[in-house]
Amino acid sequence: MKFIALISGGKDSFYNIFHCLKNNHELIALGNIYPKESEEQELDSFMFQTVGHDLIDYYSKCIGVPLFRRSILRNTSNNVELNYTATQDDEIEELFELLRTVKDKIPDLEAVSVGAILSSYQRTRVENVCSRLGLVVLSYLWQRDQAELMGEMCLMSKDVNNVENDTNSGNKFDARIIKVAAIGLNEKHLGMSLPMMQPVLQKLNQLYQVHICGEGGEFETMVLDAPFFQHGYLELIDIVKCSDGEVHNARLKVKFQPRNLSKSFLLNQLDQLPVPSIFGNNWQDLTQNLPKQQAKTGEQRFENHMSNALPQTTINKTNDKLYISNLQSRKSETVEKQSEDIFTELADILHSNQIPRNHILSASLLIRDMSNFGKINKIYNEFLDLSKYGPLPPSRACVGSKCLPEDCHVQLSVVVDVKNTGKEKINKNKGGLHVQGRSYWAPCNIGPYSQSTWLNDDANQVSFISGQIGLVPQSMEILGTPLTDQIVLALQHFDTLCETIGAQEKLLMTCYISDESVLDSVIKTWAFYCSNMNHRSDLWMDKSDDVEKCLVLVKISELPRGAVAEFGGVTCKRLIVDDNDSDKKEREENDDVSTVFQKLNLNIEGFHNTTVSAFGYNRNFITGFVDSREELELILEKTPKSAQITLYYNPKEIITFHHHIGYYPVEKLFDYRGKEHRFGLHIRS
């Protein structure tokens, strides 16, 4: 893609350009935000580094691409919410205007490079602006380990003390310290290169937890040279230092030195540029313990001998959630009109319950023919328009199921927050992770959904995790053979999201497979992940065991991007907030759903219940399988109406529809051991 690089002059924005080039993107312009008062170096902007802005004009000459700049005033960070929405007179709107101007002048602009490492504040703002302009964010440094990243930067940097004697080093990366504001750093460090600073920063990190890449504002840098500076570099002439208490600044005096750097040198440096492997070291160990499955076994036919009975839309309140399930339409023939009917019905339900759309936490989308995904997704996106209803769209699982009735193109179910409903544009009680930029970290969202959502006032932080498939994050292409690796990658992405948000306790898990031949690989992958790797690899020693039984495996018709497996589910940060022994007996005795099942003495195979408790308030998350229609009907009838059931079933089974159940038609379903069952249940109470 053709991209503009947002640059501050610092190491991160330029090092990200390096990775954009590594991933075959084309740099066509530079963009910069600077202080309106030209003599002012530091605006204390929440968003932009402005120290050293007076050198920015040189970079256009060094690289040979146009530079676009726009000024901002001091104290214009008017919207400091983590998840940004367009706000009049905020400094971010200057970035919007800058990029809009560039896009008008360069219509084939496709992407924006940004050097964010840990700052969600910066990331969400750039993503908001780019989303409004139809641009892709390229943020290859996002969530990188800082010590590892600094080591790579130093590896690619020149030896400033030996440039004359090292011809291979002379044109490499060169970033200098221009500001320090941390314990252990002072004016003597100003002007130092990254390799000179690395041991200092490592020591300060061990002693005082100083961020090695300066993500806490400990230091700022200015780049003088890089392998893609093909037309010139900045020669350091002098360093003018000044101090204000514990903050020390340097104004660099430089001279532009023209040169014609061969493209072969850049290509050589790109070849040497370290890139994170697709699998983390621990996940690489896991793949090596699995037998490799190279390809699918062949086309599988699904015979549609099913009931055309259509479950009614159900609305069920469980604790602080409203479950709106089985939204379908048969009023219209086209997929677009059916989709519009569904979202009209959903809008009416929300309106009648006085619930804004920004309170939708999670969505499950079944599509009969995945070739219609684009049409449905367009209407879905319009319904959840972030510019109207605020940031953090619902998490989502989207799969193809030919088990829907022949004249039904799509089915939608949603989970809605019913606490603190109001007319605010932003649901401030809604937390989430919505990463839209490409990186090495995990896939960006490929639709209008968040990777995860939760409620901020939930002490357990019960979180809804979007379905994850085996996409290579930096390219957003599906991983090829062996298929085992694609399955492991999908689960790694799920685990990465859980680790990032700190919600690693698994409550309910679903794995969708589009080809039954991968069933054994999925089972082994799940077993190794949950506990078996602890005994096989030191890299897994710190991981707590997960409960295998919470998994329901379902065979469906198709997955996005032709994937063979997708992992999604519900997790939480902590199972018990007030761990009080005196309360445990009371919790067990008041376990309504479990008590019902015990009294019924039913043969629910693989039954597993996880109780989440906070301040005497209990929630149950139950997984189970049933092979008797009579026992299923008894369960559906006797389960308290305050509980929400998701029923996985093949529609050829004739069942009675109930009013507190989300029906999920699938071809086949299995437990965590791979045993096939007639019915699978996920129950929340």
UniProtKB/Swiss-Prot annotation:
* Keyword Ligase applies: yes
* Additional record remark: Present with 2270 molecules/cell in log phase SD medium.
Q: Which GO terms describe its cellular component?
A: cytoplasm
Q: Which GO terms describe its molecular function?
A: ATP binding; diphthine-ammonia ligase activity
Entry protein name: Diphthine--ammonia ligase
Subunit (UniProt): Interacts with elongation factor 2 (eEF-2; EFT1 or EFT2).
Q: What is its EC number?
A: 6.3.1.14
Pathway(s) per entry: Protein modification; peptidyl-diphthamide biosynthesis
A Pfam cross-reference name = Ribonuc_L-PSP
Q: Which gene encodes it?
A: DPH6
